[in-house]
C-alpha cells in the first residue's frame, strides 16, 4: 500500500513543481469568467433582501446562464408545489369532503388523517392515480414557454394573460420576486410541518405559542 502511494506521489510530482504558463493563464481566465457570471447572477430576480445573493452550496460556482435558468425553473416549480402543500395541509385540518374516498376499502374522506400520516392510509389504487397525475403534469403541463422566463408554464394559454401583459416590466419583476420569496418560505414551512408532525404530532407551532388549542389527527 505504501509503495502504491509513493508511486502516485512521484507521478504527480512533476506537475507540482513547475506549472506551465498555459495552465496559469487558463486558471486566470476561468476565475475571471466565474466572477463575471456570479456578478450577472447577483442582478437576477431572487437575489433580494434579506439575504441578497445567497449560494452557500456553490451551485452556481461554475454555472452558465442555461444552468442558472434550469435551477431557477426547478426552484419556482418546487415553490409552487410547496405553497399548494401548505394550503392543502391547512384545508385538510379544518375541512373534509363528504362521502367515501374508497368503497372497496370502506374509507371515507373524514377517516383520512392529515399530513404525512395520510400516505399510509391511501389505498394503492389511489397512490397510483396520484403518481399518474403528477406524471401528466410533469410531462404535459409544467413545460416552460420557449424563450420566456423560468416558470412560465402558459403553453396551453393563460386565463390571466391580458392582465399580466398590461403590467409594466417593473411590476412583472416584482410579482415574480414575491412568488419566489413565498415559494421559498413555503418550502421551509411544509418541511417544518412534516418534521413537527413526526416529532410530537403537533405541527402547528404558532398555535402552541399563542395558546390556541387544536386537535391534529
Swiss-Prot record:
Belongs to the fucoxanthin chlorophyll protein family. GO terms for biological process: photosynthesis, light harvesting. The keyword Chloroplast applies. This is Fucoxanthin-chlorophyll a-c binding protein A, chloroplastic. It holds the Pfam family Chloroa_b-bind. GO terms for molecular function: chlorophyll binding. Keywords: Chlorophyll, Chloroplast, Chromophore, Light-harvesting polypeptide, Membrane, Photosynthesis, Photosystem II, Plastid, Thylakoid, Transit peptide, Transmembrane, Transmembrane helix. It comes from Macrocystis pyrifera. Residues 1-39 form a transit peptide. The gene is FCPA.
Amino acid at each position: 500500500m505504501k509503495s502504491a502511494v509513493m508511486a502516485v506521489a512521484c507521478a504527480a510530482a512533476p506537475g507540482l513543481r513547475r506549472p506551465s504558463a498555459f495552465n496559469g493563464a487558463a486558471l486566470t481566465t476561468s476565475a475571471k469568467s466565474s466572477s463575471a457570471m456570479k456578478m450577472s447572477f447577483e442582478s437576477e430576480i431572487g437575489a433580494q433582501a434579506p439575504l441578497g445573493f445567497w449560494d452557500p452550496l456553490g451551485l452556481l460556482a461554475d454555472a452558465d446562464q442555461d444552468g442558472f435558468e434550469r435551477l431557477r425553473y426547478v426552484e419556482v416549480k418546487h415553490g409552487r408545489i410547496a405553497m399548494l402543500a401548505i394550503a392543502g395541509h391547512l384545508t385538510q385540518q379544518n375541512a373534509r369532503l363528504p362521502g367515501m374516498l374508497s368503497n372497496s376499502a370502506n374509507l371515507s374522506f373524514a377517516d383520512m388523517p392529515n399530513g404525512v400520516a395520510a400516505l399510509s392510509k391511501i389505498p394503492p389504487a389511489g397512490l397510483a392515480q396520484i403518481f399518474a397525475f403528477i406524471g401528466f403534469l410533469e410531462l404535459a403541463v409544467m413545460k416552460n414557454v420557449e424563450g420566456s422566463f423560468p416558470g412560465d408554464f402558459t403553453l396551453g394559454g393563460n386565463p390571466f394573460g391580458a392582465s399580466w401583459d398590461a403590467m409594466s416590466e417593473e411590476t412583472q419583476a416584482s410579482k415574480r420576486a414575491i412568488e419566489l420569496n413565498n415559494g421559498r418560505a413555503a418550502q421551509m414551512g411544509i418541511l417544518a410541518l412534516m418534521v413537527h408532525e413526526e416529532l410530537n404530532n403537533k405541527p402547528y407551532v404558532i398555535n402552541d405559542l399563542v395558546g390556541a388549542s387544536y386537535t391534529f389527527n
